[in-house]
């Protein structure tokens, strides 16, 4: 069974103040308040996602995080005790690889959001650069977000959790999920023995490998963090031409096949 890694926002009021679990994303630790100035919190249609600030006007997230009445919060660490520099924005425009907004669990799960007005940089708000080189299997990657820290039961944290996982060969994910095609524009990342993983509510957030922004949280096993069931992440490097083209104003640019 697989899980698209969004989480109903309806649970936030009920669970965001739940007792902290020894399982901290899952299997991680509380992120340092200064290590995620690019991480954004996205609410839509009673759901929660993450995202990444690329510059003062643009956020990159997963296509399956699209919905009505989207709100984007920047500079967030604790949801209970907000930083003084938290900023709220809404989308001005949304861009998808396919004009019909279609995507699959292994293709085109990527969305660019142009914000309604520029973001002001601050102590807790700063963009993350796009990757300058492709990802390498074996890299140590950092995943982060406000998603559930337990699975299948839901326990939402007050502050984002961070975990180190490994970039794995795509064939590892094909073995775990036979429905995957022979090739795709997704990355496979996790811990083979399980215990660390992104999960529900982390969708759209970044996967940072060797210091470079290489992936977008997309989907994975359900429950999360099971042995030999890594997560799938949209490959950012493969979509660089599309991302840069849209930001530059070229709306005719096409996504890779």
Swiss-Prot record:
Its EC number is 3.4.21.-. Expressed by the venom gland. It comes from the Eukaryota. Keywords: Disulfide bond, Fibrinogenolytic toxin, Hemostasis impairing toxin, Hydrolase, Protease, Secreted, Serine protease, Signal, Toxin, Zymogen. Disulfide bonds join 31-162, 49-65, 97-255, 141-209, 173-188, 199-224. Residues 1-18 form the signal peptide. It holds the Pfam family Trypsin. Residues 25-248 form the Peptidase S1 domain. CDD domains: Tryp_SPc. The active site is at residues 64, 109, 203. InterPro entries: Peptidase_S1_PA (IPR009003), Peptidase_S1_PA_chymotrypsin (IPR043504), Peptidase_S1A (IPR001314), Trypsin_dom (IPR001254), TRYPSIN_HIS (IPR018114), TRYPSIN_SER (IPR033116). It is found in: Secreted. Residues 19-24 form a propeptide. PROSITE patterns: TRYPSIN_DOM, TRYPSIN_HIS, TRYPSIN_SER. GO terms for biological process: proteolysis. One of its GO terms (molecular function) is serine-type endopeptidase activity. The keyword Disulfide bond applies. One of its GO terms (cellular component) is secretory granule. Negative results: does not have activity on gamma-chains of fibrinogen (FGG). Snake venom serine protease with fibrinogenolytic activities. Cleaves beta-chain of fibrinogen (FGB) efficiently and shows relatively lower activity on alpha-chain. Monomer. Belongs to the peptidase S1 family. Snake venom subfamily. This is Beta-fibrinogenase mucrofibrase-2. It comes from Protobothrops mucrosquamatus (Taiwan habu). The lineage of its organism: Eukaryota, Metazoa, Chordata, Craniata, Vertebrata.
């Amino acid at each position: 069974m697989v899980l698209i890694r969004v989480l109903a926002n309806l649970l936030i009021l009920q669970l965001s103040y739940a007792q902290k679990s020894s399982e901290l994303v899952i299997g991680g630790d509380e992120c340092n308040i200064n290590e995620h100035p690019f991480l954004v919190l996205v609410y839509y249609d009673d759901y929660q996602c993450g995202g990444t600030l690329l510059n003062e006007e643009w956020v990159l997230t997963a296509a399956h995080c699209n919905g009505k009445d989207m709100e984007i919060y920047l500079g967030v660490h604790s949801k209970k005790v907000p930083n003084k520099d938290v900023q709220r924005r809404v989308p001005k425009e949304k861009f998808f690889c396919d004009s019909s907004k279609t995507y699959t669990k292994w293709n085109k799960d990527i969305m660019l959001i142009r914000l309604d007005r520029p973001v002001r940089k601050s102590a807790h708000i700063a963009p993350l650069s796009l990757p300058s080189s492709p990802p390498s299997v074996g890299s140590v990657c950092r995943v982060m977000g406000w998603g559930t820290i337990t699975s299948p039961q839901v326990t939402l944290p007050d502050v984002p959790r961070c975990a180190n996982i490994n970039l794995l060969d795509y064939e590892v994910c094909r073995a775990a999920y036979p429905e995957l095609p022979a090739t795709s524009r997704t990355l496979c990342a996790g811990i083979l023995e399980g215990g660390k993983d992104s999960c529900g509510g982390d969708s759209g957030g970044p996967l940072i490998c060797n210091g470079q922004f290489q992936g977008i949280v997309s989907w994975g096993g359900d429950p999360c963090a099971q042995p030999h069931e890594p997560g799938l992440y949209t490959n950012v490097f493969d979509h660089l031409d599309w991302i840069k083209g849209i930001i530059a104003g070229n709306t005719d640019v096409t996504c890779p096949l």
